[in-house]
């Protein structure tokens, strides 16, 4: 599913450099607040105690929230927000991710810009100047200091500036899954919970048995996400983004190591066949089969939502799997011995530049994303399995994210809900995993200015992945040129989006730095 979502998002147009205009149709009155006061009053609804902000307008207003989140969940959240703030009407508008960007630009061109939006492709949002700077609210909000550490430490959503344009809405931590039944069948010892990258590679090799006694080959790894994307973050704690990005510069020599290692595993026969290939039909007897249902794969680089949405469902009980989570390993033993940076999927949101009530819009965005009150409400709806999506599936099984707050009450409630059908042993493994995944680094196209332009116009256009995977080229052969290209695209984007002709938030020193990067990397 995620492959289709990402493919659709990345294929969408990134044209029409429109400055967001229009409004919510609420008149010309504006809330004068530029910060969050932090003053609240306790309100109880359905046994949940909320901290209702007291610094919002008391006018009757309407806010439009345009999103591609799970629709029924958002409607539930919107209803609760309106119950808390009865003077605010929330118009929650869902759009399928495949048409989201085009529909949003149409709304902008028709003077119907929503007040709050979601987005994944940061180049799309930034090049169209859709997002306002919410740093005044963010920096004064007590809750933002209690999020996963990298959100503030690495400026996630700031895009290398002192401003803040994006906030994390949906957080899907990076995770490695191991089928313990496969390890038992092969008499392979489970790796340490503080495993290293080398430990993982060894496990993949140890669990690949092509001539197995039962006549069906065992593979060490079934992949959904490529290992090179993981390696680019796992290599060092100084890395803040894919392709060895340190916050300013790229270094694709880091990526090249992981890319080559993954290619060597594929060429060496350690990676399970993928769906809709002749290799899959030969192995599982079904062109449409998925290696995650084989019972013959040790490790999976699947998405976070695959466990609840697939493996935890009744339909998969027949496959005799024992799937447990592991944190994405770090390369060095020192990093692996403690909590460390790991790749994550994060969808972002922001307040648009035309919003007439930015303080209230920020509170709505917070409720829909990282806020403690919003997460208390999410846990309530996820616990109620009678509330379903259009297909009749309980909402906890429909691409449910994880909290990005570190609030203990939220996490206790989330783990109890997430692990409600597990025994104590498996619950303990999930508790340990969740405690170790709160240094997320988002995929580059969601978090680094110019990243997708680089991928679209250079990296993907010459097909580097395919060339290396087929053994016709070495990743290291591209590292130097790709580094120059990535730095040029990034510096160009920083000047375009944030320089004098854009948001105008760069200092003279920063402008000089990026101008020099453009010159040096022509």
How would you label these PLM feature ranges?
Residues 83, 89-91, 186, 314-402:
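Extracytoplasmic/periplasmic substrate-recognition and gating elements
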